[in-house]
């Protein structure tokens, strides 16, 4: 539903694939929870407002022609998470906003390819790195300004919490868990602990360690890697250099690309040393997390 003067723009750009987005989420998450969905141009003060069955979009964005499909994908995802499944407490807002942000990124991967998805995730990482909330945890129970919770922690970092979780448990368990979470709490409310429990069940292992660090610790891992090569052994020393008040992070499966050889490391604690056998030549290049599964910053030192 648009004002007559804005209909041409709406049909050619932001809403061109609106029906495809709806079908994609239905296949991915479970049945659309309502009988219909309308996209409505309105005078809302928000860029998009995810009212159940009737999403409102700011009329000014039509006039400026900067609404964009990512906003439509984000607000449509809220029909599942935010509307049908709602966080029980405002401090768990990431259960709405982080989910919608990541689902919009998944739509981008589906529609536009993996390179577009990776670029979007890198952009979100930069937003987290540069945000003023970086020193606060996602579950900030001290927050009293509820509107202030509409920040990068609950949107972009929340999306990264889901992306990292997917990397930890694998696609099968991750998407199975998402569908189970939706079907279990549809037309109801949930807390982060509910989601953590269902994902642990889907993965078949305890994920409390992950949700504890992802949701209750501020910041992100900052890694300094130093390496030495001798014979056929590569020794890698990893230091976590983030501020002490952020705590230490566990990264159970950190991939290093040593030239063209993927090496899997386990990072746990402020200092980690691992010796990798079978590296015959002195590396020319070492890349940390080449597939972009972790929200982190890393530096790699030269051979000692």
Predicted segments with their positions:
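Short, gly/Ser/Thr-rich active-site loops of penicillin-recognizing serine hydrolases
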Residues: 283, 303-304
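Hydrophobic alpha-helical and helix-loop surface patches within well-folded domains
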Residues: 1-244
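Beta-strand-rich binding/interaction modules
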Residues: 207-208, 221-223, 227-290
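Short acidic/polar inter-strand loop motif in beta-rich domains
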Residues: 263, 290-303
